[in-house]
């Protein structure tokens, strides 16, 4: 995934009202940019961090600039725009870059399914293969050398796990795909210390046949690509 045009950098002043952030450019101009991430963004939004932002040519947008990446003083890259995760994974599957999905040829997005009025992020289909339902989650929380999901209590995420479990119990393929969007993370676990219910539901889902797959993204101001497969820890 390439950023067109390449992202521009600025220094973070503050994030506020969840959806907004103030930054200062190298030229000294203060900008208010949009933040698509509604999560806690723990460790991803420290004042003084380098922010990389994109610019929309849509004249109707109140805030034309969007926060895409954070570069920390430690040298870590973090994608804070959670909307990028689905595109990143779909692109990798289409390019046959994820061996676990190499047998599937058709990719559909945001397909209605389940018993709780849900939409699956990615539905993969192929002749002589069961359908593969993929729910994509972004992992950006780094604590004690481990990446955790979620970074806040998520009833929506809990619903997705119930839906995936039901799909697996029907004999179809159900996958929880963790797109690791923090370069400092080298393993992933459920954040039981943040959302115990989510952690418990994930364990139940795995016991019912839901697969958990983790891949890390390589990121720069020019683009992103999925790289190494990471280990998911059962804690």
Swiss-Prot record:
Pfam families with a match to the protein in the record: SfsA (PF03749), SfsA_N (PF17746)
Organism: Photorhabdus laumondii subsp. laumondii (strain DSM 15139 / CIP 105565 / TT01) (Photorhabdus luminescens subsp. laumondii)
Molecular function as annotated in GO: DNA binding
Protein name from the UniProt record: Sugar fermentation stimulation protein homolog
Signal peptide: none
Record-stated family: Belongs to the SfsA family.
Chain ranges passing through the membrane: none
Top-rank taxon: Bacteria
Alphabetical list of CDD domains matching this protein: SfsA-like_bacterial
